Amino acid sequence: MVHVCYYRNYGKTFKGPRRPYEKERLDSELKLVGEYGLRNKRELWRVQYSLSRIRNAARDLLTLDEKSPRRIFEGEALLRRMNRYGLLDESQNKLDYVLALTVENFLERRLQTIVFKSGMAKSIHHSRVLIRQRHIRVGKQLVNIPSFMVRLDSQKHIDFALTSPFGGGRPGRVKRRNEKSASKKASGGGDADGDDEE
């Protein structure tokens, strides 16, 4: 008997806009989607949702007394997390700075954006393709999620995967075919394969 799991994850990952056809919002969203090479608006709403949850947590902590153990403990943990992901500088160690964070701060820390800005890809869209086709690794771990949030200490370890043709791995399909036809011509083995691809 095959066991089928009917578990469903009910955790919200994004929140759609309250007013669907607001012109200013539509224009600003489209600009961000184009600038950061996002697949759809849902990817943007997902970032906005995580930002709003972080800001709500900071706002909640700011209402507590400064000497409150919960504010000290949770506030420091939140700031540490923001510093680790490069969203805040080491000098910005107050909860007020968390409230000033924007969606762009988060989008700048995505793997897709960082691969493009580091010059490994020709465009932001090329960067997404490289990541999805498993050409990029962070440290020793191959990462194929464009929305992967890069930590500050991991940023210098972003490189091409060892199995990728860009990282000195096995050459790609077209290059292998060209090398094969070149070796045939060199050995004088008659015509190259007739089934050329366009």
From Swiss-Prot:
GO terms for cellular component: chloroplast; cytosolic ribosome; cytosolic small ribosomal subunit; nucleolus; plant-type cell wall; plant-type vacuole; plasmodesma; plastid. The modification Phosphoserine is found at S68. The keyword Isomerase does not apply. Gene3D superfamilies: RNA-binding S4 domain. Residues 109-180 form the S4 RNA-binding domain. It holds the Pfam family S4. Keywords: Phosphoprotein, Ribonucleoprotein, Ribosomal protein, RNA-binding, rRNA-binding. The keyword Methyltransferase does not apply. InterPro entries: Ribosomal_uS4, Ribosomal_uS4_CS, Ribosomal_uS4_euk/arc, Ribosomal_uS4_N, S4_RNA-bd, S4_RNA-bd_sf. GO terms for biological process: translation. This is Small ribosomal subunit protein uS4z. It comes from Arabidopsis thaliana.
